[in-house]
Amino acid sequence: MTYTTMDTQAGQLMLCEEQGRLVAVSAAQPPEGAGCGSNAVLDEACRQFESYFEGKLRRLDLPFACHGTPFQERVWEALRQIPYGETRTYGEIARQIGHPRAARAVGLAAHRNPLMLITPCHRVICVRGKLGGFAAGIRWKQWLLQLEGRDLFADVLTDKNVRDRWT
């Protein structure tokens, strides 16, 4: 397993590669036993993340592998379908995957997402427009949503999707 780090305005991002695929993207420390280095996958990932952070790239196209429970994998797949600049509630994701009463479980699955940004769990918010949690911290979530063009204060009052969820 090889990792690299990159600095962003929100903090340091760690990218981990194994067998030609990204297996972790997070604000956490590298896993024990991982060696710091560079290879084609990590170099391309850094290039794409830099373009994303500059607002030039809206969809990351990188090889990845993530493993979780069947429920987690369904949640993560649903999160990858949320378009750039849009949000969904935990309840909406729960209904989308066929478990309408599992909003909290969706939140837990999002928290355990090993591939921040590739599986954009920052795009999931609470039903009343509150941000909810984020494994990398609320500062990261706020920064990522603002980067994608979300006005976090105006959205609560003017976003038709959020307004419709309240009624």
Task: Annotate each language-model stretch with its function.
Residues M1-R101, L147-T167:
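Basic nucleic-acid-binding alpha-helical/helix-turn surface characteristic of O6-alkylguanine DNA
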Residues R101-L145, L152:
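Short glycine/serine-rich loop segments
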